[in-house]
């Protein structure tokens, strides 16, 4: 049987399958569907015609708008059909037509979305993605499988992100861009193919990063992308001791040094 809190409000035309767990003050609108292995935490709201299926957990206060399909099976040809999961954090907003898939059998089996994220109409989160907090996916953004996006990144409308790509903290991706390679924290990328266009100085300033730290990040950026040599080699050559008081600079150095299946986006389409 389903576990449905007494304070939940479920429209008589909605379908809540036996086994679903429905928290306090959840609202489920007309013709919405909730699968038998779904958990909706307190204060979640499903608008009319929203679909939540699979082994999906949606955190407190999140909102799913009409025609969104959350928790569908992964669009991965190698998936063996086993049951995998989708975990969505608190206070996320999924607008009309958003799709999010569960993980795949060969990718860890989990798609994980953090708290306080905004997914605008028709954006897509594929299998095995890992998303942090306070991220914005604008209309029609497409994330392929295994993408990682760090906190406070913003992706403009219609951009597409290649599988296994990483997008760093507070990066800004321009609309209609093709993100083929990793994007450093605080980077700005535009175009198809995507070209690194410098640092997201406006975003850094708005988030309260001191001007002195922004200058240090610029110095690191120049040392990595404007000097002779490879991106990873240049990053490895930087003396971390010079930036111990600037976590943003160290974050860029560590992001590049962490290694990845993808190259690093640069002003020259990758070195």
From Swiss-Prot:
One of its GO terms (cellular component) is membrane. The keyword Acyltransferase applies. Its main location: cytoplasm. InterPro entries: Acetyltransf_C, Acetyltransf_C_sf, Hexapep, Hexapep_transf_CS, Lipid_A_LpxA, Trimer_LpxA-like_sf. Gene3D superfamilies: Hexapeptide repeat proteins, Udp N-acetylglucosamine O-acyltransferase, C-terminal domain. It is found in: Cytoplasm. Its EC number is 2.3.1.129. It catalyses: a (3R)-hydroxyacyl-[ACP] + UDP-N-acetyl-alpha-D-glucosamine = a UDP-3-O-[(3R)-3-hydroxyacyl]-N-acetyl-alpha-D-glucosamine + holo-[ACP]. GO terms for molecular function: acyl-[acyl-carrier-protein]-UDP-N-acetylglucosamine O-acyltransferase activity. CDD domains: LbH_UDP-GlcNAc_AT. GO terms for biological process: lipid A biosynthetic process. Pathway: Glycolipid biosynthesis; lipid IV(A) biosynthesis; lipid IV(A) from (3R)-3-hydroxytetradecanoyl-[acyl-carrier-protein] and UDP-N-acetyl-alpha-D-glucosamine: step 1/6. It is an enzyme of class 2 (transferase). NCBIfam families: lipid_A_lpxA, PRK05289.1. PANTHER family: ACYL-[ACYL-CARRIER-PROTEIN]--UDP-N-ACETYLGLUCOSAMINE O-ACYLTRANSFERASE, ACYL-[ACYL-CARRIER-PROTEIN]--UDP-N-ACETYLGLUCOSAMINE O-ACYLTRANSFERASE, MITOCHONDRIAL-RELATED. Involved in the biosynthesis of lipid A, a phosphorylated glycolipid that anchors the lipopolysaccharide to the outer membrane of the cell. This is Acyl-[acyl-carrier-protein]--UDP-N-acetylglucosamine O-acyltransferase. It comes from Agrobacterium fabrum (strain C58 / ATCC 33970). The gene is lpxA.
């Amino acid at each position: 049987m389903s576990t449905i809190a007494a304070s939940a409000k479920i429209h008589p035309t909605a379908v809540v399958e036996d086994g679903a767990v429905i928290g306090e003050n959840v609202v489920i609108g007309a013709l919405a569907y909730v699968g038998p292995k779904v958990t909706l935490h307190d204060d979640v709201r499903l608008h009319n015609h929203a679909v939540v299926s699979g082994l999906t957990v949606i955190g407190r206060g999140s909102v799913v708008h009409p025609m969104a399909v959350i928790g569908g099976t992964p669009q991965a040809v190698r998936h063996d059909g086993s049951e995998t999961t989708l975990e969505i954090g608190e206070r996320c907003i999924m607008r009309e037509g958003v799709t999010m898939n569960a993980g795949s059998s060969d990718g860890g089996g989990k798609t994980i979305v953090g708290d306080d994220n905004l997914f605008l109409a028709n954006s897509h989160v594929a299998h095995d993605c890992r998303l942090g907090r306070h991220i914005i996916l604008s209309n029609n953004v497409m994330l392929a499988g295994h993408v990682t996006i760090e906190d406070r990144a913003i992706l403009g409308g219609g951009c597409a992100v290649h599988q296994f790509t990483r997008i760093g903290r507070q990066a800004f991706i321009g609309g209609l861009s093709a993100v083929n390679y990793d994007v450093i924290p605080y980077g700005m990328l535009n175009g198809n193919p995507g070209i690194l266009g410098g640092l997201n100085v406006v975003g850094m300033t708005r988030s309260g990063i001191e001007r002195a730290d922004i200058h240090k990040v610029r110095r690191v950026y120049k040392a990595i992308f404007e000097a002779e040599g490879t991106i990873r080699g240049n990053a490895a050559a930087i003396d971390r001791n010079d930036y111990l008081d600037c976590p943003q600079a160290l974050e860029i150095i560590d992001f590049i040094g962490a290694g990845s299946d993808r190259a690093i986006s640069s002003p020259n389409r990758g070195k």
